[in-house]
């Protein structure tokens, strides 16, 4: 399984460990199963989500979508549902952004109540403009729910890559930290 759940007291930590952590049919289903487990847990909880290696998430797996056209629509609906679930979860959510968060990975970070990004490496980016892919209404709603208006416009229209310090100034994240401190701070 690409998602590993651990628990530290009242905090559930989900680590996504699948290379570039891209959304495919199986990974989206695994996300929903994992969130079902978290939501079924008794007691007060917080949820921390992180990636592994140099990637938080690089978003949709476009190669998988091209190879599985009959399943791509369901997978994309599953991603929309995931983004919506994260926005309204009935527990505090924190993104421990360990590395690159691009496209759907950047959108996922906008579902968290709080975001902590590595200060020295990794970019947060919505590159859809460079790929010629428009944001769906659900994707737009997710990023619009969390980003300041000027940052929302800049990130969508230009595809700008924000490093940790720039993401902090732009209001994308609330905190930046050294690599070793991102998860503990979360």
Predicted features and spans:
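Hydrophobic/aromatic residues within transmembrane alpha-helices
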Residues: 49, 108-110, 167
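Short helix- or helix-capping micro-motifs
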Residues: 58-60, 143, 151-160
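Conserved CoA-thioester-binding segment of acyl-CoA-metabolizing enzymes
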Residues: 1-52, 84
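Glycine- (often His-adjacent) and acidic-residue-rich active-site loop
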Residues: 4, 51-85
């Amino acid at each position: 399984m690409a998602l590993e759940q651990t628990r530290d007291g009242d905090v559930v930590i989900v680590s996504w460990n699948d290379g570039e952590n891209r959304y495919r049919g199986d990974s989206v289903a695994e996300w929903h199963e994992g969130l079902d487990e978290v939501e079924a847990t008794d007691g007060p909880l917080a949820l921390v989500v992180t990636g592994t290696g140099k990637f938080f998430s690089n978003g949709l797996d476009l190669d998988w979508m091209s190879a599985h056209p009959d399943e791509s629509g369901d997978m994309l609906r599953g991603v929309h549902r995931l983004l919506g679930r994260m926005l309204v979860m009935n527990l505090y959510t924190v993104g421990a952004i360990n590395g690159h968060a691009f496209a759907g990975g950047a959108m996922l970070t906008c579902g968290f109540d709080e975001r902590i990004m590595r200060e020295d490496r990794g970019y947060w980016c919505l590159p859809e403009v460079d790929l010629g892919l428009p944001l769906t209404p659900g994707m737009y709603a997710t990023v619009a729910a969390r980003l300041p208006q000027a940052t929302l416009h800049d990130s969508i229209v230009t595809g700008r890559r924000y490093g940790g310090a720039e993401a902090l100034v732009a209001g994308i994240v609330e905190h930046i930290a050294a690599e070793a401190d991102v998860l503990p701070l979360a």
